[in-house]
């Protein structure tokens, strides 16, 4: 028996109809998928933090290095006598212009200055020399000499953008995003800043976590490329390509 052949025109029509259906089905699937993503994004709330209400110091208690004995220099935070602990000294760029050689050890009139110079071992944009001053190098942060295990605090309300635990570079470090903060250059303008805390011994927060000003976020250490316990404290603006930024 001879099979019936499909006329060429009907055959062409069936192929065209099938292609049309396939294209439509593909487009429809894509449309549904995209709209589902948009709906999902609109349902998930955007993470925000409390508005700016001032700042706090990243370190609340630090040793009076000028009063420590040689043996006490290497003690952890919890082992240093409380009588030799105090508030973090003020950061004053002019202090770095005074050389250590001009400061007589044991002179009570220069005790605070000596302690400040020891505490801020590397100033902003300084180098690693003993008497480094600002803008003598390319260090984009302030190194704060503190014992291992010193509590570290968020300087302002923000969102943890990075909570890295690593053995190289910055070591264990945290980056916090601070939105709508007054600009350092013009307090009438608002911008986004990123504060970073590096070489930590312990990271106590997770990425995406909302933190408040003065909330403890970690413990200081000497992880990464650090050669002694300290806090690498850095602030970057929103134009930095990455955080913490390094040239």
Region spans (language model):
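N-terminal Lys/Arg-rich, disordered targeting/topogenic segments
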Residues: 1-12
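Membrane-interface motif at the C-terminal end of an N-terminal transmembrane signal
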Residues: 27-41
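Acidic, glycine-rich catalytic/binding loops that coordinate metals and/or anionic ligands
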Residues: 182-186, 206, 212, 234-247
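Active-site loop architecture of trypsin-fold serine endopeptidases
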Residues: 220-234, 238
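Zn2+-dependent peptidoglycan hydrolase active-site motif and core
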Residues: 154-204, 229-234
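Hydrophobic membrane-insertion alpha-helices, especially the h-region
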Residues: 14-31
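Surface-exposed, glycine-biased beta-strand/turn segments
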Residues: 37-172, 181-185, 213, 222
């Amino acid at each position: 028996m001879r099979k019936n052949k499909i006329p060429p025109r009907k055959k062409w029509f069936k192929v065209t109809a099938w292609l049309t259906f396939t294209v439509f089905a593909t487009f429809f699937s894509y449309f549904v998928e995209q709209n589902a993503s948009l709906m999902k994004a609109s349902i998930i709330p955007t993470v925000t933090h409390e508005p700016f209400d001032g700042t706090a110091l990243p370190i609340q208690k630090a040793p009076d290095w000028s009063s420590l004995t040689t043996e006490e220099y290497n003690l952890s935070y919890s082992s240093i006598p409380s009588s030799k602990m105090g508030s973090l000294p003020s950061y004053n760029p002019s202090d770095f212009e005074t050389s250590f050689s001009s400061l007589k050890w044991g002179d009570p009139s220069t005790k605070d200055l000596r302690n400040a110079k020891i505490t801020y071992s590397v100033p902003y944009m300084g180098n690693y020399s003993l008497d480094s001053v600002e803008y003598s190098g390319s260090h984009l942060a302030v190194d704060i000499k503190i014992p291992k295990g010193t509590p570290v605090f968020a300087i302002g309300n923000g969102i943890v953008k990075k909570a890295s635990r690593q053995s190289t570079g910055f070591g264990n470090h945290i980056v916090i995003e601070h939105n709508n903060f007054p600009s350092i250059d013009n307090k009438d303008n608002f911008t986004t800043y990123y504060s970073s805390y590096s070489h930590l011994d312990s990271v106590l927060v997770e990425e995406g976590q909302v933190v408040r000003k003065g909330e403890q976020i970690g413990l200081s250490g000497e992880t990464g490329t650090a050669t002694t316990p300290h806090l690498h404290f850095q602030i970057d603006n929103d134009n930095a390509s990455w955080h913490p930024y390094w040239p």
